[in-house]
Amino acid sequence: MKELNSTPSKRDKKTFLIHQFLFVILLATSYPTSVFSQTYRKIAGWSDEVNNRIESFLNTTLTMNNRKVAVFDGDGTVIGQVPYYLADEALYRYADKNYKDRNDPQAKSKIAILNRMVKDGNNVGKVYVEDRVHFLAGMTPAEIMDMGYECYLDSYQGKFYPEMKQLIANLKEYGFEVWILTASPEFLYQKFLAEELGLPDTQILGVKSVVANGRLTDEIIMPIPQDDGKANVIPTFIKARPLIVGGNSRGDMDMLNQSCGLKIVVNPDDTTIRGKEDGPMNGYTVKQYWGKRGSGHREM
């Protein structure tokens, strides 16, 4: 038997080098294709100027290796809330069905909370926001999710802004983590927002409270995502500074200022002059305030 030579011939070496060279070329040419395959889809209803600016910004993020985060307010930013906030509508509906005709201590306590909220009237104030959670205390997370989902199906389906859904789809195409940050109870909003926007429910953040023995308690977990608390939620729970932040109201101002890239102001109010309690927005409407900030934001 002829002894096999374990040493490659010159021809074998040449073939091996060619194959190796081809492999390197294929690797080098296929890599950019995977990195730069994102395609921006124009958002109908927004101007060419706005679309071009968003696309240009997204293209600057293509080579980023760190987390790309976008944060949006919920009520009034991604979904319309007229004439009432879904968070309030859901509570009133539930009380009408389950507590109205009862005289036991639990029912009286829940109705008293709603009466206090009506008397307060400031549905973006922290006390009002906390009272929503107090109303839900004692229920299971699943019951609260279903309450919000049923109210959405009955009264708010079709009120998502299509432009915002298109924007979020573009962001996902470019590899962004999209988070929704709302001052409404977290469990109440998670199910329908996650389903409509195609996001994990863990990326829907709202007012949190401790769950003990499978039921919501009155113990609220700080920070409350309203006003300055919204800005504090970002480093506390998201743990990354966002490249894009979008909101629509005074309560979103602090959160918007956390963006290190685009600030998107959706349907800003141009009627109510803000007071001293609104800090730097004092003397301006929401639209006027962001207008004077110059090109650091984009109004939709």
Segments predicted by a language model, with ranges:
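Sec/Tat signal peptide C-region and signal peptidase I cleavage site
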Residues: T33-S37
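Solvent-exposed coil/turn segments that connect beta secondary-structure elements
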Residues: D75-T77, P83-Y84, S209, P268-D269
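Short, solvent-exposed loop/turn and secondary-structure capping segments
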Residues: Q81-Y84, A90-L91, K191-F192, Q258
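A metal-dependent, Asp-based hydrolase signature
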Residues: P83-G158, P162, Q166
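C-terminal cap/substrate-recognition subdomain and adjoining C-terminal extension
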Residues: Q38-E49, R53-E55, N59-V69, P141-W179, ...
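Asp-based phosphoryl-transfer active-site loop
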Residues: K68-V82, L256
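Bacterial N-terminal signal peptides
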Residues: H19-Y31
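N-terminal secretory signal peptides that target proteins for export/translocation
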Residues: M1-T15
